[in-house]
């Protein structure tokens, strides 16, 4: 047969014939295809969408009518959720299942079943917390996909309250290990008792009820509870559990009821009587216990009266000077004894408070209204010092070794006849001596004659001086008087005094006087009720709680007023909150705006919200508070986390930007050169060495073991010069200037005196570096260009120069900050060879700092616009062109202008009179 068709019709016919052949072949094969039912097997497909807030490891527990139970893991996933695919031999009419964990927590209370099968396949969709079994995706997705929280249901377990805590004065949060029926009516069978007396439950609510059951609820009572009594909760099937103090301590109702604004906490002494007041709002009874001797075991009890806002008071008639005392508190029927947190002095080892006459502890020469002159915060040059380190060396020339009184000794000299002690520090030129912890701390036995050592970052009694630094720790007045003598002596020598404070933690919350007086209030706790240790050194103080914050502020103000202190360094300040720090700044500024506040602004990962932490990131929210700049520290010498890590001065390239960030005082200088946002340069504390980690000299020994001491000395000088010429506040560890070593010990907090002492012989051995240091200090003090007060001033006057790799150079122009030098160039060369940099102009330049000498006197001059910077050296030059405005001191320049103006006025006046 012949057919004649068109081209398009031929193509259509071909497709049709192919389709017919394919369908025919499939039809021929159909009899050979078997369903799962025909194959003798049953396939189960379970799709499971867990609750969004559940991180439990769910699996399937399946059983047939033959009771062959077994666990099956989810072995796939799709858009709906997890998928479990299982094959069973034989045909099934019904399959039981539970969605559960290996600990037998179930997502619903009921056993459920798959009862619909299609050709040997049973496919269902399940939603966590929902008892319904869905046989289609459309049905399961209806009504949205928001899932309720899953109450963990346990099989064969005894009911118990796993959480019972007081969140408000009349509200208890509970959580149970197994679900209980919830009707949303009445008290749900829950019984609350206070010291055995049943309280009225107003209502019980829950946001996590599923099919009439829950494990979480909130109990609201008809009245506020007495926090000093034992509160319990129980329910049929759930044994009685004591309620702990939860968020109630942070609640507005608690603060309103118990915040005490008064200034008389602690003891108030007079010869006629001493008044005592302690804050213990959760106590049902409080007693004052007095002791005649520091080590008496039994004292005299006096019942205190309940005062306002959770305080307790008692007046003890007569002169109670040098009487020791504690408080006993009864909380939930248990008596506990504690030292007064506000005690101004304590017994030996700080186990009892002491009543002292503060006026009687003033030295014969005591000028609390007078301090060394100091106006601008960035005029500070801070010298960190440990009381014992200062004088304990046999070569120190000081008699009161390891004591406060060592700071009062004059004319001390070492074995080589060289100046030591306060005379030496004064001559060095620093402005502030920062004393490492001088409050009463644990871990040193004040009654032992054996040599003991600790840095002191484990506070015991915040408002009392450390007894091991006094000549008589048994007399509570002596430690106070001798510390005042030390402060006065330093002031008399033109040195201000800063105090290192540790309000972020105490060694142990359980042993602290805070927790004994008000359990659960002064420390931070995690969700399980465990006191947090966010520093790694002890339990964290909850400064965000009003009375804890009040204590810190009161304590700082007490030290500032009573001891006439000039600054405070806050250990691990990032654990404190912004509100606490800004309140301290406000209060101190009202007393004396020149008082320094600085702190470690590291983010320690606290329970505080990020924006609330007193960290570097939030520096712009804390004006007037300075933070340690670890960027320039690590940039100069290498990371402190790796002892062998190098930095700019000791051989690591591409660290220039870190150095530049420090040079500008951490301000927001440019897109690349910035640190903590829009801050003032006064907020950057620049340093390369402190008591933590290796000394700079020890670090250089570790990072550059093959270099000789001459090379390492150059590196050391280079590092010191970067710090002292940078904008901001320079900070040094005592002895850094004479290459202090701790023998490679990077954490000498409890090492012996041999490791920690200031070895005064090093001063003589390294007198060249000491003099170099002094010269840099003199340069900084006499030239305000290195101490600009604002970010805007720095951006206007400080420009970085184009430099080779491993070189940082910059120019300060325009008589910046009213400096007498019009143009200053500073350069740091970390290379092993000399480099040349191009200057902005050609003129006569005076060199005042090089790799060997430093100061304000001209070492030599050169002309031109090229500067050769020696290897591993710093250089500072200024425009020395003959110009009256740049060669004369600024005050003479000012006088000349005034004289000129006066002459002009007189001339014009005389001319006017002659014309008349």
Regions found by a protein language model. Name each.
Residues 270-284, 797-838:
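Carbohydrate-binding surface patches
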Residues 56-66, 177-204, 284-299:
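Short, surface-exposed alpha-helix to beta-strand junction/turn motifs within ectodomains of secreted
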Residues 38-52, 78-168, 213-271, 275, ...:
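The feature marks proteins involved in alpha-glucan
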Residues 349, 354-356, 360, 585-586, ...:
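Conserved alpha/beta catalytic core and glycan-binding cleft of carbohydrate-active enzymes
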Residues 321-325, 859-884:
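C-terminal beta-strand-rich structural cap/linker in extracellular carbohydrate-active enzymes
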Residues 670-671, 728, 732-745, 757-824:
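Glycan-recognition and catalytic regions of carbohydrate-active enzymes
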Residues 25-40:
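Sec-dependent signal peptide cleavage junction
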Residues 388-563, 573, 577, 581-592, ...:
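Substrate-binding/active-site clefts of carbohydrate-active enzymes
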């Amino acid at each position: 047969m012949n057919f004649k068709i068109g081209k398009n019709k031929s193509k259509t016919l071909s497709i049709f014939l192919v389709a017919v052949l394919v369908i025919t072949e499939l039809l021929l094969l159909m009899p050979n295809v078997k369903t799962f039912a025909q194959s003798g097997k049953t396939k189960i497909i379970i799709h499971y969408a867990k609750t969004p807030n559940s991180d439990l490891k769910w699996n399937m527990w399946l059983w047939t009518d033959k009771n062959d139970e077994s666990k099956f893991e989810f072995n796939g996933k799709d858009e709906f959720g997890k998928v479990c695919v299982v094959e069973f031999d034989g045909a099934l009419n019904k399959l039981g299942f539970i969605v559960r964990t290996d600990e037998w927590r179930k997502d619903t209370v009921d056993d459920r079943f798959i009862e619909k099968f299609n050709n040997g396949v049973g496919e269902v969709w399940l939603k966590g917390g929902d008892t319904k079994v869905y046989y289609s995706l459309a049905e399961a997705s209806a009504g949205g996909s928001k899932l309720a929280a899953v109450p963990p249901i346990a099989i064969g377990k005894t009911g118990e309250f796993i959480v019972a805590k007081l969140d408000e004065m009349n509200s208890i949060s509970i959580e149970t290990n197994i679900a209980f029926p919830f009707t949303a009516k009445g008290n749900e069978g829950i019984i609350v008792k206070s010291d055995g007396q049943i309280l009225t439950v107003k209502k019980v609510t829950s946001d996590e009820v599923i099919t009439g059951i829950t494990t979480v609820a909130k109990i609201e009572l008809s009245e506020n509870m007495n926090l000093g009594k034992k509160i319990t909760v129980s329910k049929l099937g759930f044994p009685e559990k004591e309620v702990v103090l939860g968020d109630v301590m942070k609640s507005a109702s608690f603060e309103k009821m118990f915040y005490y604004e008064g200034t008389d906490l602690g003891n108030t002494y007079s010869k006629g009587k001493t008044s005592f007041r302690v804050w213990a709002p959760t106590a049902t009874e409080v007693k004052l216990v007095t002791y005649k001797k520091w080590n008496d075991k039994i004292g005299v009890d006096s019942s205190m009266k309940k005062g306002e806002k959770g305080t307790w008071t008692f007046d003890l008639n007569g002169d109670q000077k040098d009487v020791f005392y504690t408080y006993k508190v009864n909380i939930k029927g248990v008596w506990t004894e504690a030292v007064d947190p506000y005690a101004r002095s304590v017994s030996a080892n700080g186990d009892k408070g002491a009543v002292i006459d503060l006026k009687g502890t003033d030295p014969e020469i005591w000028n609390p209204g007078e301090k060394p002159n100091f106006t601008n915060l960035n005029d500070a040059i801070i010298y960190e010092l440990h009381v014992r380190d200062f004088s304990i060396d046999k070569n120190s020339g000081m008699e009161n070794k390891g004591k406060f009184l060592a700071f009062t000794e004059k004319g001390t000299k070492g074995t080589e006849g060289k100046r030591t002690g306060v005379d030496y520090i004064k001559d060095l030129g620093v402005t502030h001596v920062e004393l490492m912890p001088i409050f009463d701390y644990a871990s040193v036995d004040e009654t032992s004659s054996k040599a003991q050592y600790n840095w002191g970052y484990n506070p015991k009694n915040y408002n009392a001086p450390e007894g091991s630094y006094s000549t008589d720790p048994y007399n509570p007045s002596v430690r106070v008087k001798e510390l005042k003598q030390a402060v006065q002596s330093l002031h008399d020598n033109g040195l201000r005094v800063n105090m290192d404070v540790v309000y972020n933690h105490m060694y142990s919350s359980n042993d602290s006087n805070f927790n004994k007086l008000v359990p659960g209030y002064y420390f931070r706790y995690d969700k399980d009720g465990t006191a947090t240790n966010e520093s790694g050194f002890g339990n964290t103080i909850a400064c965000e709680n009003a009375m804890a914050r009040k204590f810190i502020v009161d304590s700082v103000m007490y030290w500032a007023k009573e001891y006439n202190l000039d600054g405070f360094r806050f250990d691990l300040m990032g654990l404190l909150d912004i509100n606490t720090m800004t309140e301290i700044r406000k209060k101190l500024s009202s007393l004396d705006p020149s008082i320094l506040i600085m702190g470690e602004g590291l983010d320690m990962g606290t329970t505080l919200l990020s924006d609330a932490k007193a960290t570097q990131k939030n520096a712009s929210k804390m004006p007037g508070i300075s933070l340690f700049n670890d960027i320039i520290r690590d940039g100069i010498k290498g990371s402190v986390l790796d002892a062998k890590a190098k930095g700019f001065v000791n051989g690591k390239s591409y660290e220039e930007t870190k150095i530049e960030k420090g040079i500008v005082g951490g301000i927001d200088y440019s897109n690349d050169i910035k640190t903590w946002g829009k801050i003032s340069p006064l907020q950057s504390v620049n340093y390369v060495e402190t008591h933590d980690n290796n000394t700079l000299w020890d670090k250089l020994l570790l990072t550059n073991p093959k270099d000789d001491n001459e090379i390492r000395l150059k590196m050391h000088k280079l590092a010191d010069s970067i710090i002292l010429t940078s904008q901001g506040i320079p900070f040094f560890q005592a002895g850094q200037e004479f290459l202090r070593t701790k023998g490679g010990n990077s954490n000498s907090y409890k090492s012996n005196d041999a490791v920690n002492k200031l070895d005064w012989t090093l001063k003589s051995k390294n007198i060249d570096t000491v003099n170099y240091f002094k010269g840099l200090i003199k340069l900084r003090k006499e030239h305000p260009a290195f101490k600009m007060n604002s970010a805007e001033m720095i951006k206007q006057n400080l420009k970085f120069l184009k430099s080779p790799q491993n070189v940082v150079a910059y120019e300060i122009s325009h008589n910046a900050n009213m400096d007498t030098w019009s143009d200053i160039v500073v350069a740091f060369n970390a290379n092993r060879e000399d480099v040349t940099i191009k200057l902005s102009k050609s003129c006569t330049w005076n060199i005042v700092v090089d790799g060997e000498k430093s100061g304000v006197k001209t070492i030599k001059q050169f002309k031109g616009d090229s500067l050769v910077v020696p290897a591993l050296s710093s250089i500072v030059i200024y425009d020395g062109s003959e110009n009256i405005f740049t060669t004369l001191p600024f005050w003479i320049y000012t006088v000349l202008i005034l004289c000129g103006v006066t002459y002009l006025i007189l001339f014009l006046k005389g001319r006017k009179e002659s014309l008349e």
